[in-house]
Amino acid sequence: MRTTQYLLSTLKETPADAEVISHQLMLRAGMIRKLASGLYTWLPTGLRVLKKVENIVREEMNNAGAIEISMPVVQPADLWQESGRWEQYGPELLRLVDRSDRPFVLGPTHEEVITDLIRNELSSYKQLPLNLFQIQTKFRDEVRPRFGVMRSREFIMKDAYSFHTSQGSLQETYDAMYRAYSQSFSRMGLDFRAVQADTGSIGGSASHEFQVLAQSGEDDIVFSTGSDYAANIEMAEALPPAGGRADATQERVQFATPEAKTIADLVEQFTLPIEKTVKTLMVKATKESGHTLVALLVRGDHELNEIKAEKIDIVAAPLTFATEEEIRALVNAGPGSLGPVGLNMPIVADRTVAAMSDFSAGANIDGQHFSGINWQRDLPLPRIADIRNVVEGDASPDGKGTLLIKRGIEVGHIFQLGTKYSEAMKASVQGEDGRNQTLTMGCYGIGITRIVAAAIEQNHDERGIIWSPALAPFQVAILPMNMQKSFRVKELAEALYQQLRAKGIDVILDDRKERPGVMFADMELIGVPHTIVIGERNLDNDEIEYKARRGGEKRLIKTDEIVDFLMAELAQ
């Protein structure tokens, strides 16, 4: 590719609305342009990277035995109503009607469509197992699109779906896809971790996320210092504190706290140890519980894990915090003065709270708190559950070492769905015994567009992007200095360009009438791994300058050795 025949839309300045480095660099490198909130046009440089990601994923899917298909983006609403996700999915599901007032959705995922296809195409266990995938545009109506293509409304995703007649068969495919994902991300040069994860609105039993480690990540990833345990913070179990609960040493005392609206206020104003305070959070209860609200107790310095709390049978899903009006109707106090003593509703205490003594909490009277609260003396022990996020230093759930927490960007997610969709949509085949058998399913997603952003978050410097060789839009850049004024510079640049193209190398020849500084800056910005500079002075010594993007190594190479040298570098 020649720059004079290419749309190289680089920017010198960082756009003001770009928050994270990947968004900034994708705009500056001319990879994307914003059309509307959460919607982006992919320019040639960005599309070249995107296609390389797609090709790696496609190759690994083929190697894992998956078969490619293509399904419609627009899906009939009745399939979502049949699966039960029409209401469950929420406002992220973009709903629309056609000219005949028939309801449709823009697909964020394709579980319903693939299940409908399979129930009409398969009839016998002999046709299974089957693993189908597609690489296609998806749409989620994000309430606040942000971070460029990291959290956009329209995005490209690889989604695969497998069908089985046994859990054992599903496990085999799940393991194969786990390996395929690991191989894909390794080939892309990403520093990633596979972690245990929650199944979310997709549903099912087992699930793993593939997280690219980056400070800008939105997810907290938990690791053990003493084993290979890794999990999303939503799933990481917080073990009960070691040792028993200490005996009471204080009497319960009520004291005025008119200015303390939060735990932070309470700790600051009364110099209380935060680990001796308890937060009382009220959420909606299920109808079956016979109650309106449930009180959840966590230690003052801990955070409620909403995913864990939502799984408690008396807590309504999705988890919804009570409004101040709803709280006052039952307690006659505001959220800043709530506590467990005398509370007339179901209470669920975190394991850590259940092990506390002499703690402080609200008195359920505005502007009043208790100190010196003790279980069994001042109130009975409530229901106990793990409902908090782990923190660094907690014991690892597998009993080996302690926990560390890092930030991650989710780029892949695999699920063992079981029979959630096949039962709801009556997808079955004739089993080996002649009876109808409900299909067991797995689903497997990779965020193609998100991978591009995640790779940049991990690989950049002050000059721009540093692509791995597998993802770079171009592998080699040829920069001829003043080629319009030097016949031998132009002749060698053209010859080298043709030689590299003949060897199948993605090469860009910068044949613009630009200053050398501009040419260098652009190639560093878009992240070309290998740059060769052809200038009159070095040609006097029959040499060409080579520069590596990663590490910045510079070397002078003999002109008749440069092709072999580059091929050796590209083979590494």
Curated annotation (Swiss-Prot):
Pfam families: HGTP_anticodon, tRNA-synt_2b, tRNA_edit. It is found in: Cytoplasm. Coiled coil: none annotated. GO terms for cellular component: cytosol. Keywords: Aminoacyl-tRNA synthetase, ATP-binding, Cytoplasm, Ligase, Nucleotide-binding, Protein biosynthesis. GO terms for biological process: prolyl-tRNA aminoacylation. Its EC number is 6.1.1.15. CDD domains: ProRS-INS (cd04334), ProRS_anticodon_short (cd00861), ProRS_core_prok (cd00779). It catalyses: tRNA(Pro) + L-proline + ATP = L-prolyl-tRNA(Pro) + AMP + diphosphate. It comes from the Bacteria. One of its GO terms (molecular function) is aminoacyl-tRNA deacylase activity. It is an enzyme of class 6 (ligase). Its main location: cytoplasm. Catalyzes the attachment of proline to tRNA(Pro) in a two-step reaction: proline is first activated by ATP to form Pro-AMP and then transferred to the acceptor end of tRNA(Pro). As ProRS can inadvertently accommodate and process non-cognate amino acids such as alanine and cysteine, to avoid such errors it has two additional distinct editing activities against alanine. One activity is designated as 'pretransfer' editing and involves the tRNA(Pro)-independent hydrolysis of activated Ala-AMP. Consists of three domains: the N-terminal catalytic domain, the editing domain and the C-terminal anticodon-binding domain. Homodimer. Belongs to the class-II aminoacyl-tRNA synthetase family. ProS type 1 subfamily. This is Proline--tRNA ligase.
